[in-house]
Amino acid sequence: YAGLDFFAGYPITPSTEIAELLSLKLPRKGGKFIQMEDEIASMCAIIGASLTGLKSMTATSGPGFSLKQEAIGYAVMAEIPCVIVNVQRGGPSTGLPTSPSQGDVMQARWGTHGDHAIITLTASNHQDVFAMTVEAFNLAETYRTPVILLFDEVVGHMREKLQMPDPEEIPLVERLWTSVKEGTDFHPYLPREDRKSTRLNSSHYS
């Protein structure tokens, strides 16, 4: 529904169910699922996938979210759209994998070094998770930035019935690609009527 093309992750409770389901369902729609060797590689993989034009996402929990911070900062600086899901669990360090917590809000805002804005959404039930996941991808593409989705262990492990809209009824923001002639300046922020910015279609990445 959100247009996800690529997922890279590393198993960590209580976010593992996201990876397990996507490993089955994402390839059916032509997407790519990769289990990486660690959390840092997972974040770097979705950055690389996004540079090629794919809508990309990873999912983790507190300790893994800490490891991803340097790469998240790079994605912010380089204006690379992607989505990071943090299914929060209790405690510092390894913590309590099956204990609910909402303690990573400050880290979502100020987890990396330097000063930058970040978009973070949080959901309290699965209907919100569905809607906010779509919104997260749209915001990432619109503002050319990583977007963080914060859930907790309760949301991560519970099951609910959802009201699923028709896919055609969901507005999706797609990336605008352009190309320029050699020797011509590229201006991604030139005003457009739709207020969207373009990305340079580089053969080095695609």
Where do the protein language model's features map onto the residues?
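Generic detector of well-ordered secondary structure
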Residues: 9, 48, 138, 144, ...
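Conformationally flexible catalytic loops at phosphate/diphosphate-handling active centers
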Residues: 147-202, 206
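A very general structural signal that marks isolated residues within well-ordered alpha-helical segments
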Residues: 52, 142, 204-205
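Conserved thiamine diphosphate
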Residues: 99-153, 165, 176-181
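Short, solvent-exposed polar/charged micro-motifs at secondary-structure junctions
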Residues: 44-45, 131, 159-160
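Short, solvent-exposed amphipathic alpha-helical segments in soluble enzyme
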Residues: 23-25, 73-76, 134-139, 164-167
